[in-house]
Structure formats: structure tokens, C-alpha cells
């Protein structure tokens, strides 16, 4: 099948990285995939390395009069059966044609941007329920989860390379330094975890505020903000527990990454983690914005490694059943076959 995937997103982010993984997986499975991306030489190189030939376009603001016609020409030349527009900006530029237009949502976006789409895909059941509650026909709304790379078996990084003393407990958090991610809640929890260090791997507009909060809480020496890093698997292998303290998290790819790496997960009960986790079985859930509850849950895992291992093994089982590449790719291919234009 010929499938075009249109992504106008940022260089880093959960949706953008899954777009790459899915494009590569579909290609390896024998589908013919055209990735159309916002100009990003690094993403283009990664896709080209996997044998794809990405088209790079501007995907600018309201004054961008060039991307629409160029996208239309690229799609007409490729002649896909299905076009998948990832998120609102791509859907705004995509037009109907001799293909089925699918919008893929990873959050609670304005559905007016997807008005030309014939089908919508959400990556959580809660998101699909929200889509249909807005009046979208249920038969044209579909749940298709993400898959993440299998990170089990990675070699732990030396504590010194992470800036963490030998013997210290390590709490890992991953994501953009944005208020939605709730990393300030994790920092406020840290004074109640005197033997633990927090490694918050990501970059974003909240860096200065998080650094100031760490100083104010007296934990600056135990909070590490290394920026974006490629070695996620090594960091997961090095930590004692993964924290996902988000205020707002439609899915929570990091939860699934933690499961894949056999790491115990403690998450705030935002939309995605609350749907993913079975409390006290494959992770621990705490109320959002509750530093005390977060500290208690993290402390419980750090004090009782056996219970943490049990959570981690149950999470690994969930990953293998529902979020590994093979089962998710099979669902995507079945969906594409069911909607493709003859």
C-alpha cells in the first residue's frame, strides 16, 4: 500500500518521534511510505538512513502560501491510497484528493482543523471518546496506540556520567521542560526523599524556573537538568524509578518506555497515565500536583526494591502485549487496509 505521512511538528516530541518510528516500521513491513515533514535536516537524515525519501516543506503560519500547493503536488506525484495528517498544522495544509485523508491526534485539538479528514485516529481511548463527544461520527473515530522502542537490556550508565554519587537513589523524569509536565512537583517532592537525586532529561521554557525552585527547596545539588539526550535507554537502565508527574498528559509515552525497560513507574493521574496504569499492579498513581503523595509513592518504591521489581515486570508484560512494535503495527496496517481508497 502507498501511504503518505505528513508531519509539521517540532524537532523533538512524542508525536514526532512516533511518526518516525511508524514510518520506518511500515516501510520495513513492505508498505511504500512518503514522509512529508517540516524542514528539519536531522529528521530527514534519520528517515533517509532507513531508506525513505522525505519531502521537506515550510509548514509556516497564515502567510505561508507555498506549502499547500507544494504538498498537493507531492501527494499527486506519489499517488497514495491513504494520507495521514499528524496534528492540526499538517491537517490545515492537507487537502482531499484521490486518497483517504486521515487525521491523527495526540491531544485535545480543535477539530475544526481536521474538517477535511474522513477519519480521525486517537492514541488513547479517552481521546477517541472525547472526539466522538464533539460530534464526530463514532464509525470514523479509531483508537490506535503508539509503540515505543524496546529498551530492555540496555547497559546502565556510570553514576559519575550522570552527576550522581555512587549509592544514591535515582529518580528519572523525561520530557519537555514545560509546566504541563509537572517537574516542579517532582522538585517539591525531593526534600522528602533525602537519599534520592532527580534527573530530569529534557529542554524547554521552564528551565530557569525549575533551577530557581530547586535552589529555593534546598535540593539544587540533587536536581540534574542535562537537556535532551539520545541515550534514553541507558538512563532508564540506570534509574531506580521513573516519575511522570504531569499535570496534562494525553498519553504518556514515557510510561510505556519505562514499562519496556522494566523500570517501576510512578505517575500523576493525568488523562493518559490514568488510562494506561492499573494502580498497584503495573505502576503507582498519585493525584496531580500533590508533591507529598508523589514523595510517598516514590519513597515506597525506593525503600522496597522487591515491590518495584514486581511493578516493573507487570509493566513489561503490558508493553509486550499492547505497546510493542509488532502488535501496534499490526493494528495500524489493518486500519489502513480497512480505509484505503481503491
Positions of the model-derived regions?
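Short hydrophobic beta-strand element within catalytic cores of glycosyltransferases
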Residues: 36-37, 264-267
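A short helix/loop element that forms part of the nucleotide-sugar donor recognition site in Leloir-type
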Residues: 153-165, 307, 316
Amino acid at each position: 500500500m502507498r501511504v503518505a505521512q505528513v508531519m509539521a511538528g517540532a524537532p523533538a516530541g512524542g508525536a514526532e518521534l512516533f511518526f518516525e518510528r511508524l514510518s520506518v516500521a511500515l516501510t520495513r513491513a513492505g508498505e511504500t511510505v512518503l514522509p512529508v515533514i517540516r524542514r528539519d535536516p536531522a529528521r530527514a537524515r534519520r528517515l533517509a538512513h532507513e531508506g525513505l525519501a522525505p519531502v521537506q516543506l515550510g509548514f509556516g503560519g497564515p502567510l505561508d502560501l507555498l506549502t499547500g500547493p507544494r504538498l498537493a503536488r507531492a501527494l499527486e506525484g506519489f499517488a497514495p491510497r491513504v494520507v495521514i495528517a499528524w496534528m492540526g498544522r499538517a491537517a490545515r495544509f492537507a487537502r482531499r484528493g484521490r486518497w483517504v485523508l486521515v487525521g491523527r491526534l495526540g491531544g485535545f485539538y480543535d477539530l475544526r482543523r481536521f474538517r477535511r479528514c474522513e477519519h480521525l485516529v486517537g492514541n488513547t481511548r479517552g481521546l477517541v471518546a472525547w472526539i466522538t463527544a464533539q460530534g464526530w461520527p463514532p464509525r470514523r473515530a479509531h483508537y490506535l496506540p503508539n509503540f515505543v522502542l524496546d529498551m530492555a537490556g540496555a547497559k546502565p550508565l556510570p553514576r559519575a556520567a550522570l552527576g550522581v554519587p555512587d549509592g544514591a537513589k535515582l529518580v528519572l523524569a523525561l520530557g519537555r521542560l514545560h509546566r504541563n509536565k509537572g517537574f516542579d512537583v517532582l522538585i517539591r517532592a525531593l526534600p522528602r526523599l533525602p537519599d534520592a537525586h532527580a534527573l530530569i532529561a529534557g529542554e524547554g521554557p521552564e528551565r530557569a524556573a525549575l533551577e530557581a525552585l530547586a535552589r529555593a527547596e534546598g535540593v539544587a545539588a540533587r536536581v540534574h537538568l542535562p537537556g535532551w539526550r539520545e541515550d534514553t535507554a541507558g538512563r532508564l537502565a540506570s534509574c531506580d524509578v521513573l516519575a511522570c508527574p504531569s499535570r496534562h498528559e494525553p498519553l504518556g509515552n514515557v510510561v510505556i518506555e519505562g514499562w519496556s525497560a522494566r523500570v517501576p513507574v510512578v505517575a500523576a493521574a493525568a488523562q493518559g497515565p490514568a488510562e494506561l496504569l492499573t494502580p498497584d499492579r503495573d505502576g503507582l498513581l498519585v493525584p496531580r500536583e500533590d508533591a507529598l503523595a508523589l514523595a510517598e509513592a516514590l519513597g515506597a518504591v525506593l525503600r522496597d526494591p522487591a515491590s518495584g521489581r514486581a511493578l516493573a515486570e507487570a509493566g513489561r508484560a503490558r508493553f509486550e502485549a499492547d505497546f510493542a512494535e509488532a502488535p501496534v503495527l499490526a493494528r495500524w496496517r489493518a486500519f489502513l487496509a480497512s480505509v484505503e481508497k481503491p
